Structures are given as C-alpha cells and as structure tokens.
Amino acid sequence: MVEGWRNGFRDATNSKPLFVTIYATVIIGVLVSSFYVFSAIYSPTNGSSSFLSFPPLSTSGRIHSLPQENATLELPVAPPPPPQALPPPVLEEAQGNSLGKIWVSPPRDKKMPPLETFKLTKELFGERVKDNVIIVTFGNYAFMDFILTWVKHLTDLDLSNILVGAMDTKLLEALYWKGVPVFDMGSHMSTVDVGWGSPTFHKMGREKVILIDSVLPFGYELLMCDTDMVWLKNPMPYLARFPDADVLTSSDQVVPTVIDDSLDIWQQVGAAYNIGIFHWRPTESAKKLAKEWKEILLADDKVWDQNGFNEIVRRQLGPSVEGDSGLFYAYDGNLKVGILPASIFCSGHTYFVQAMYQQLRLEPYAVHTTFQYAGTEGKRHRLREGMVFYDPPEYYDSPGGFIAFKPSIPKSLLLDGKHTIESHFILVNHQMKQIRSALAIASLLNRTLVMPPIWCRLDRLWFGHPGTLQGSMTRQPFICPLDHVFEVNIMLKELPEEEFGPGIGIREYSFLDNPLLPKQVKESWLDVQLCQEGKEGCEASNNTSPSRVLKFPKRSNEDTFKAIFSSFDDVKVIKFSSIEDAFIGFSDKEREERFRRRVKRYVGIWCCEENKTPGHIYYDMYWDEKPGWKPVPPQTPEEDHPPL
C-alpha cells in the first residue's frame, strides 16, 4: 500500500500542480484520521473494555545480584525495571484475523441469547478452531479475573482459537458481554471460590475429564489449561514439533533433566504429571485414555483427577518412541506421551523460586501457580509479583495513595555463615520488624503499603527438607514469594474493625515497576529521608527540598506523622529511604492493641525441619518482645498454634 502511494505521488509530481495539491491533501487527511482513530481505540479513558487498553505485560523474570562488598545492603523496593512495555497490538491482530473477534462486546440493546446457544457442540468448537487446535480453560465466577487474565495473554500473543467453559450462568453471561468466547459446561456450580481440595474442587476436576472425553471425538486437538496459569509465549510452534505425541503434559518436576528446550527426559522425571497444562490429540489411544480416566473418577468420588491420571498413565512407562523426539510409550503401551520441560512450562516453584528458565537463559512459555500457599489469594499475588496479572485500572491508583520503603539488611545477615534454620529466621525476622513498622505507618496515614521484596535463606515446602530441594537450581539467598512468610489470604481478608482496627491494603513488591501503573501515580512522588532530631535541618516540618525530598525525624509518634503527612494527601506515592526507628508507637493504646491483634495473624509458618514431627515453625510478628526467642517447632500439642 505504501509503495502504491509513493508511485502515485511520484506520478503526480510529474504532472500538474493541482494534482500535487490533491495528493498532499489526501495523504495528510489519512494520517490525521489514522492518528485520531488509534488514539480513540487505545486511550485509557475509552469506554470500551479496559482490557483493550492494557499494554502487554513484561514477561522478564528477575534474579537479583547480591553485592558482596558493602557492610549494609540497601535493597530496592522492587526489581530492576522491566523492558519497556510494547505498545498495544493492532486491533485486528489482538482479536484474530480469521476467527470471531474477542473483546468486542455485543450491542447493549441485544438480548442475552438462550442458554442452549452456548451448549458444548462440535459446531460451537469448530467456530473457534485454528489449524485444528482449540485452547480451553474453564471455571466459575469466582475465578473471572484469572480467566480474563488468561484470555488477555493469549490475545496479546495473537491467539484467538480459544474457548472458556463457564461452570455457572453468572460467569457465562459476564464473559458473553465482554466479548469472550464462552460455552456452557452445564455444571450449575456455586459462584464462590470452592477452595483447593474441597469436594466441590474435586467435582471441578471431574468436569475437566468429562470435557476432554467429550471434545476429542470432535476431531480437534485440545490444549487444556487450568485458570491459575498464564501463557507468556505462543506454545503452538513448540507443540507442533511433536506431531506424533498423543498427549503432552506438564509436570511438578523441580530438578532439571535438560538444559535446553527439549522435552524433559521421561526416565528422570519422578514428580507427578501435572494436568494444569496438557495437550491432547484426537487419536484412538488418547480417546481410550480419556474414557477410562473418566470412568475411574466417576466410579470413586474420592479419587483426585490428577492422581487418577498419573495412576493410569504410569501403568506402563516406556520404552522410548524411536528417534530422538523425547516421546515414550505409556498407559497401554500404545499411547505416546511427552513431558513438557519444567524449565519453560513452569510450575510455581521453577518460575517464582528457582527462576530456572532465567538461569538456563531460556524463554518461558507458561507459568502455573502451583507450589504456593494462601489459597486463591496466594495464586493471584504470585502472578502480581511476576507482573503477569491484569487488574482493573483502579488497582493501580488506590484512594489514599501508597506508601513504600527501602529495606535495609546488613550484609552479614544475608550472606555470611551457613544457610540454617537459625540464620534464615534471623534474616526474615529482621525484615519482618521493618514491615511491622511500615504496616503501622500505612494504617496511620490510611495508605496502601507496597510490600518490599523478602529475602529468604531457606525454601518453604510441605515436608522436611535440608533447606532447598536437592538437585534444584534454587539460589541461596533468594527473594521468596510473599506467601512463603505471610498469610496473604489473611492480609487481604476483611477483618472486623472493632476487633482488629482499620484494614491495611497491600500491593506486591513489583507494583511500582509495573507497566500498567498510570502516569498520574508515577509522577506524584515524595521521598522521605529519616534524620536524627536535633541535627541541623531535621525538624518536624512539611518543608521539602527542591528535589521533592522531605527530611523527617526518627522515632516520631502518631501525632507527628499525622500532622506532617496530612499536607501530602494529594501525593500518590510516599517512599521512605528507611523505615527502621521511624515510628515509636500509637498514641491511642486501644488502637495499638487492635493493630497488634491484626498483624499477629498476618504471618505464617516455615516448613519443615527434617526428622521432626511436627517440623513446622511459626513466624512471630513480635518475636523481638520475647527474650530468648528461638525458631523451634512446637514441643507439645498445646504449643502448636500461631502466636496470637
């Protein structure tokens, strides 16, 4: 098209001046119109779906290098800034050129079609298939934000051959009006979060198996996904490398078996095959497996879907399929299976704890929030820490603004000596005390606290271990997910104010580096430097330097904080250069007691010491008030409770 305009303009310049004027006018008009149209489409204030205005999030991981020389470590509030976010994709690219458009809402004057319209049929699936592949997830209304995140990542990757199974009509209607392809699972489930391991959770697993068994006879390849995972890279070319595979499955493997993007070596994979990400081809062997798997689950409602899958697939393992594909025979000796490499089809451990893909210099395709704690809230927070979760715009511009601080950790706590339970708790407790002060200040100023990155020496698991999983690529020390130390679900829960005081909002440590943070937040900033009262220039005042820096006395009380910082209510982000010794306590003792009751519940456990029953150790938010406190497991059943 550009070449055509160029040739036309060249011809015009060789003819009459009138034509030159006409061509110039037309070209200018096209450029102005294009600018107007694209501005309207991608303006953040556009009334269309807010997801269309989001730029693709950074998928770069983060491993923090540790300075070895300084006696005291000044750690960043968040990791180094991610690569500059790409601009939003061209509308047709984001929505798919050949399939029905995504994120285009039906006209509001249109009535909701009858439920039968969304019935699972070959024709409905056929409308979304591309290259004979369909990508599917399913869930209920409680997981709608996960589902929208899942869909948005795929459309950012220019994938539109997707369908979402709705397990309740509330989700079905909500997705329909957002322009997301949806079908009715016919489950009529509750719209609330059912909880991992609950009977309803197991029912959801059975729905997955029934769905696979129903879809494979349609003749389409099925990439089946849980809603608590996101796609970071188009997996279609990778899956196409293994055309002979009947099933390609992810796994819970935490020890690398390969260092490139080959399939994991099946003989070395001892962990469970994880059915949160797996690809099925409509072969006779795959159909036979799906049918038997369904029958086993329907016959015994106590069998977990993933356990059932592992049991029948592992009836026979091997031999390898001829060639060097990495496939192997399993199940009945005819099923050809491949195990997706855990380094790039990541679990919550290989991605968030080990950052295995980054250490091996590989590009991750997906991350699944396994190996985590604190339930659904913990999963959401993990994805937020990784800057791969899509929240609505108001999440990034909270009323009251934000408070952040730069943690300070002595080098000796982080790097010196052996990595033991004692050295781990000394390190974490040092950070916990600073977080406790920051929570108090956030509560005083009615601001949302941006949590700092937390450094750990030891991994957290469900069983006794020597500190890290042997053979894994976990570095020590490492920035551990917030749910390793804090009960994220409790921090986000609405607790009765009369007993626990006002709620305290939190954000993930990477929040201020997120490309979705709006300009009005990034540019509204106050740096606070603590100083020793009595020294020159250090007095309780709201006077700032020309570079927008406020000097503030250490060991200030509640009244001083309120008096000074009330002058900065319009500032979005207040960042303290240090939080140590900033606050000496609440003036209102009843409020302080309610605050203590609240934050005592915020911390969790470390697990677990080897050869001890029980082997878990409770974190204690007020460890420093107990002389001689030691990190030891409960010695009696009466001691086995959080230190409330």
Swiss-Prot record:
Its EC number is 2.4.2.-. It is found in: Golgi apparatus membrane. It holds the Pfam family Nucleotid_trans. Disruption phenotype: Increased elongation of hypocotyls. Reduced root hair length. Reduced content of arabinosylated extensins in cell walls. Increased lateral root formation. Residues 39-644 are lumenal. Residues 1-17 are cytoplasmic. The conserved DXD motif is involved in enzyme activity. Belongs to the glycosyltransferase 77 family. This is Arabinosyltransferase XEG113. The lineage of its organism: Eukaryota, Viridiplantae, Streptophyta, Embryophyta, Tracheophyta.
